Amino acid sequence: MIWTLVLAPILIGLLMYALPRSADVAAKWFGVAVAAGAFGLTLLSANAPDESIRWLQRPFTANFHAGLGGLSFWLVALLTLSTACALASTRIPRQRDFVAQMLLLMGAMTGLFVARDLFVFALFWDLMLIPVFLILIAWTPSKSDASAWRYLIYNLTGGLALLLATAAYGVIEGSTDVLGATLGHGVAAVGPAWGEWIFAGFAIAFLIKTPVWPFHTWMPQTYADLPPAAAAVVSAVQSKGGLYGFIFVTAPLLPDQMHAAAPLMYVLGLVGLIYGALVALVQDDAKKVVAYSSLSHLGLILLAAFSGNQVALGGAAVYIIAHGLFSAGIFIVLGQVESREETRMISRLGGLGARNPRLAGSLTIVALAALGLPGLCGFAGEILILTGLYQSGAVWVAGIALVPIVLAAAYMLRLFQGIMQGPDAADLPERADASPLELLAVAPLVVAIVLLGVDPRPVSDARSVAAPAPVSAVSER
């Protein structure tokens, strides 16, 4: 059942190219149905046993081993839900091709999060780059493909580093089928001579993917050039691949190297936190406000990942899902604004709230979650991370991290006020308010934002990431 979540979207995405180009509307809603069905299947697979198919025996053992325990379950649920919501809201030329690429992306990212073999993890890591690159090439609003190639070169560099580190680990240990072990148990430790090099390969890949300052320069223009539906999914889920890798791969496999790298990662995380918040404050492009705010938010999760504190790790799990929910919601609403007003520049917008109260209501909830309002999901993750950092003895880190968290209120309120409040923009025609279908596209994310804010325990308890599960059809190593 778990491999069905991976293979079905990929196969359906490829088969969609057999549909006539005139079937754009049907393709859109078929894509929504596939993503919604995958979300339902994910919920039904919460306690499914691991699945493993024997594969390589030389130069090391590698198996198609998949599991859906711990944080993997919540990330796949976030992925399928955000994809369904994003596709339901999309308005784009050549929707058949776009939906096909989005389903390919969903399948590849699902493969990444369910992989319990490190080599399979690395393969899906590179596979998920292809749909995003093709979307950037085909639908970028600019005349240049620079952002597409920058995205590909940066992330392929990280993917190559990950693949080399994975191959080295496999040759040294004899197997890459190691990610299914319970966190901290049953995993062979790599010697210090090779451990630092392998950790460096993993870290380069994960820092680029997240991204973390100063490896972030591919991200702002990529988010700006992606169609809103694609930006919603990439920001919500693909950016979590690096953080998931630190928690799920390096923490159990290379604990000594994780501990040794913590001071450096604290510095990178704090710089990203502050830099992202300050740059978000002065952006005129609404999508770049969200991009730089993501750089800040993800820096906070990086601090938690290297704290070694269970409360902070629980907060990291919550904030990974929380950021996915509100960032997807913001990009979807900004897409609805841009489709009406034909601009996303804050300086050219204003007064939309009075004319579009339903649209304003949607933006209000997701923006309040992003700035950390108590009772919504963002606050739950932040408070757990800060508490855990304090408990771990990193008091100075927690203290500095408070500053950009406060700045989040400033840039999110500026975003909301610039778009929804103030005098009407004189050169913008009056448009209809959000339709019931557009509200329905955001509603599941809003419900999840509230539920996670009220009770974050189901997600925070998933900090073990690789929950132990029986394996069906386990191959002999």
Label every model-predicted segment:
Residues 1, 12-100, 175-184:
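Transmembrane helix-loop-helix hairpins at membrane boundaries of multipass inner-membrane proteins
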Residues 4-24, 204, 211, 433:
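N-terminal signal-anchor/start-transfer transmembrane helix
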Residues 10, 31-40, 80-81, 103-107, ...:
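Alpha-helical transmembrane segments
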Residues 24-35, 146-156, 356-360, 436-441:
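Alpha-helical transmembrane segments and their helix-start/interface "positive-inside/aromatic belt" motifs
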Residues 32-46, 155-166, 366-369, 445-454:
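Hydrophobic alpha-helical membrane-insertion segments
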Residues 175, 182, 226, 356-358, ...:
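Cytoplasmic/organellar membrane-interface segments at the starts of transmembrane helices
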